[in-house]
From Swiss-Prot:
Function, in words: Involved in the early to middle stages of 60S ribosomal subunit biogenesis. Required for the biogenesis of box C/D snoRNAs such U3, U8 and U14 snoRNAs. Part of the small subunit (SSU) processome, first precursor of the small eukaryotic ribosomal subunit. During the assembly of the SSU processome in the nucleolus, many ribosome biogenesis factors, an RNA chaperone and ribosomal proteins associate with the nascent pre-rRNA and work in concert to generate RNA folding, modifications, rearrangements and cleavage as well as targeted degradation of pre-ribosomal RNA by the RNA exosome.
Protein name: Nucleolar protein 56
Residue(s) carrying Phosphothreonine: 468
Pfam families: Nop (PF01798), NOP5NT (PF08156)
Subcellular location: Nucleus, Nucleolus; Cytoplasm; Nucleus, Nucleoplasm
PROSITE patterns on file: NOP
Family, as annotated: Belongs to the NOP5/NOP56 family.
Nop domain mapped to chain residues: 292-410
Modified residues (Omega-N-methylarginine): 359
Crosslink site: Glycyl lysine isopeptide (Lys-Gly) (interchain with G-Cter in SUMO2): 87, 230, 240, 540, 564
Gene for this chain: NOP56
Residues bearing the modification N6-acetyllysine: 561
Amino acid sequence: MVLLHVLFEHAVGYALLALKEVEEISLLQPQVEESVLNLGKFHNIVRLVAFCPFASSQVALENANAVSEGVVHEDLRLLLETHLPSKKKRVLLGVGDPKIGAAIQEELGYNCQTGGVIAEILRGVRLHFHNLVKGLTDLSACKAQLGLGHSYSRTKVKFNVNRVDNMIIQSISLLDQLDKDINTFSMRVREWYGYHFPELVKIINDNATYCRLAQFIGNRRELNEDKLEKLEELTMDGAKAKAILDASRSSMGMDISAIDLINIESFSSRVVSLSEYRQSLHTYLRSKMSQVAPSLSALIGEAVGARLIAHAGSLTNLAKYPASTVQILGAEKALFRALKTRGNTPKYGLIFHSTFIGRAAAKNKGRISRYLANKCSIASRIDCFSEVPTSVFGEKLREQVEERLSFYETGEIPRKNLDVMKEAMVQAEEAAAEITRKLEKQEKKRLKKEKKRLAALALASSENSSSTPEECEETSEKPKKKKKQKPQEVPQENGMEDPSISFSKPKKKKSFSKEELMSSDPEETAGSTSIPKKKKSSPKGETVNDPEEAGHRSGSKKKRKFSKEEPVSSGPEEAAGKSSSKKKKKFHKASQED
């Protein structure tokens, strides 16, 4: 009997599943295929032994990287050693990736199997995984997979500012396309403007200069001595400017209308702008090549080096190529044609555009191309894998190529490669130290600026926080100053006031309108407007010793006076009662008279 266990890697953790014991694994194939889509049947065949969840997304990313690289992570090792049986010979572990299976078999000693029934079982586990693990939903599993996928891709697609070879690939491709377009458009301008001024084609050879002159001259009959200075500025040659002026006076070209001249000038301006953009793009390419591949640029030139990188796909791919591949890079058609026809294979590809092969004699072109390809391969590897790329090695390699050329021509023996590389190493260390010193200086300046900025922000925030409570205190003090002390109403017993309480000012009674009186509750209004009873006046001869009592008495007098002057508002029921009593009195008087 064989104990079959299956390892399933998920974004949320590792799952170890066990299958029912069978004599042969192949007997499980039809049962598994039938039960993959049915959860109930699948549970009868497969059961979950253990589930090891990842503690965080960072741990999940580490485990995913380990599985992709074929390395047994500590979490996976702990799971397998804990939950697999101790008798390793009877255990068969099914895995989805052969690399991780080989690593488990080598490190832990378990027999691993991939493919066949294992693939079908993993398909079913992947389909029903959220049902096998308690507490895991399909939505949470999908979110975990999405997050891990983004993190894994982010680590794979690394962005390094110093090795932006993709920008070089796009720049050289655009530069080649611009060269073709400018050449085509310039020929169109020459043909179009040649009907009006055919002599200008023979005088001016440069396409960009010809387009500028066509835009400036326009109608040749309007060209005179006043424009000679501007012609000299455009052509940068006084003799050519004088020849253009003389040719315009005796030209054999046809007359042209104003609308045709407008179209020619417009098209010429477009060609001029394209040529200017081409120059700026070339400057940009040179700066990028000096940052990314300085040694290759110093050896073979920026344009040829960029074409090699573009053809290889990246600087890393170019560094991985052998020198024989670099030699014929760009001549694949000729190579396969030669292999098909059993003819001579090409000696050089893109490196033919370098100056070295053109300077070599015909019999030495193959030798120098092979030597140059060897040095290009070395330079690309130095640029790709050095921490601080410098142009020192490229310059030394260029000197070696020059010495080899002179050796082919004159027989002068070049220096040994060992001596040249020792010298280059010393200079490269000095250059790297200088570059690191500059970088550290820039970093210190940046940190100093950042520190100043943070200090300014902290100072501003502290000022704001200190000014805020002061403003709050001011705003809280202002209403206290404005607020007047209102006298409190004291309950009266038998119409007598408490003599211990004094009022600084009498409380003004609120005047009510008729509508408010009608809408308010009569009982409340009656209760609120209670008339104080009159007090017995003190004898004239009596003096008051206590000042507080005297103040209280004066206050109570004012209050009684105020209550007499103010009309007492009564409710509608009291008013109705008074009117009815008056009517009764009148009726009683009339009955007595009768």
